[in-house]
Amino acid sequence: MINISDNYGIFHTIIPFGDLKIDRQELYLLMGYGHQVPDKPYIEQIDKMLDELADCCTPEYGYVVQPGKRLNSENLQIAETILQSGKIITSSLREADHFVVFIATVGKGFDAWNRKIQQDDDMVRAFFADSLGSVLAEACVAVMQERIEREIMEQGLFVSNCYSPGYCDWPLVEQKKLFAFFPEQYCGVNLTESCLMVPIKSVSGIIGIGRNVKKRLYSCEVCTMTTCVKNRKNLTF
């Protein structure tokens, strides 16, 4: 049970693969289908790959809860750490007085499975694998957020959406600051010199907590990150 008056210890959970809710619309979007549905043979291939992943992946997440605040229009402070979170995220989290700092991962099993596909030189499966991994990583975060929100609301508090370095004008290099809240190789995740995570389908980020915190729509219409696949303003169907 989360209690923000506690000593801010680390919470850790392994997620049964069956608890992950696969967002098919998001999957097809990442695969380039927009709002269309792939042909039946491709859907059958996706289903087969999900069965394979259920046998080899161990999704998990861990997080800490720390006090924090908005410092100015572009910076948040969590404990003693100052984040260059940018205007979009800072504004969205302006009411938060505590923050969840998290790491979530599909696990090393995905990387081993994905390497085998690459070695087999199956371009279709390789393409599907990358999209599946991304959706599974988001599903891990969704499970975590749902559980956190349920417990936080019992205390009369609310949570924000999740925000991660590399999105919404928050520099990717800021992941180093988030990882500093955890022991090395926490959840089996390493951060490379270029601030990429290993296993590859892993996510780090923050969630705001507070009595007046709201879940706001992601501000894709004002984000300057034109290469982001999430940026709906760049999608044409």
Residue ranges of predicted features:
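Conserved active-site and cofactor/substrate-binding residues in soluble primary-metabolism enzymes
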Residues: 41-44, 48, 135, 139, ...
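Short terminal or interdomain "cap/linker" segment that borders an active site or interface and mediates
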Residues: 155-232
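Short cysteine/histidine-rich metal-coordination sites, predominantly Zn2+-binding motifs
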Residues: 236-237
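Structural signal for hydrophobic packing residues in well-ordered secondary-structure cores
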Residues: 50-57, 148, 152, 224-227
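Internal, well-folded beta-alpha domain core
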Residues: 121-181
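Intrinsically disordered or highly flexible coil/loop and linker segments, enriched in small
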Residues: 55-66, 141-142, 153-158, 229, ...
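Active-site helix-to-loop segments that bind/position phosphate- or nucleotide-bearing substrates
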Residues: 2-126
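Short secondary-structure transition/capping segments
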Residues: 106-107, 150, 204-208
